[in-house]
């Protein structure tokens, strides 16, 4: 791999782009979404942040950037400190401001999750994301105004207390973070609550969704969404054994 390639950038429909950390393994890296507006742009989740992401983004867009994290886990919020305008839910504001390996679940990441280290002496087993105090607290019903488009904040707790999604009604697009993706759903973490997680998934079904851009894996539509939710409810996509659910 070219040592200079730290992020890949792929344009999708509706002025949305997918950014990926090229040196983080596919099974661990999160999807970083770039939503372009007429007056400002939105970055949804920021990855591990082991490499400078803002330099690449500012070469692509000259508009002001809002960086919003769907939750405070290290693989989504590690790069948040690189941005001046930082949005997140109040339930996890203390984690963003005072992160530890335990509170951000960085104690789960292993050396094999990195294809290449940011520098030779780097030890992922000791790494913790930088503090990133939230400048813009967002809650259920708040609207992120990008000029020619708006995204509504939805609170979907369960995976974590402050997990949020973003809904663009005009295009039927939902950004779900770790509330829903095509994989085994993490409902076993220290602040996960499976029963609340289920309620959030039932609520997700109510939206007239065309496309889900998730926190991990490929994007998908409503039919696939319903299959994933049904499989989770039956225990197939849960990290917990039946007695724990």
Ranges and model annotations:
Residues 6-59, 165-181:
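Conserved beta-strand hairpin/beta-sheet module of binuclear metal-dependent hydrolase folds
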């Amino acid at each position: 791999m070219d040592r200079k390639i730290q992020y890949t950038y792929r344009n999708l429909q509706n002025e949305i782009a997918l950014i990926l950390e090229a040196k983080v393994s596919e099974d661990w890296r999160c999807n970083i979404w770039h939503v372009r507006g007429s007056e400002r742009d939105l970055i949804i989740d920021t990855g591990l942040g082991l490499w400078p992401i803002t330099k690449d983004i500012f070469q692509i867009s000259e508009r002001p950037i809002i960086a919003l994290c769907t939750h405070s886990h290290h693989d989504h919020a590690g790069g948040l400190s690189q941005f001046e305008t930082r949005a997140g839910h109040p339930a996890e504001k203390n984690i963003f401001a005072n992160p530890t390996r335990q509170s951000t679940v960085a104690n789960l990441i292993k050396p094999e999750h990195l294809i290449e280290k940011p520098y030779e002496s780097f030890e992922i087993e000791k790494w913790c994301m930088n503090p990133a105090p939230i400048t813009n607290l967002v809650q259920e019903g708040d609207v992120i105004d990008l000029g020619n488009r708006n995204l509504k904040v939805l609170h979907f707790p369960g995976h974590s207390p402050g997990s949020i999604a973003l809904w663009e009604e005009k295009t039927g697009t939902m950004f779900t973070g770790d509330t829903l993706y095509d994989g085994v759903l993490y409902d076993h973490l220290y602040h996960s609550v499976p029963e609340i997680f289920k309620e959030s998934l039932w609520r997700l079904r109510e939206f007239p969704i065309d496309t889900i851009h998730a926190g991990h894996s490929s994007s998908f539509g409503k039919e696939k969404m319903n299959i994933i939710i049904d499989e989770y409810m039956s225990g197939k996509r849960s990290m917990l054994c039946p007695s724990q659910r």
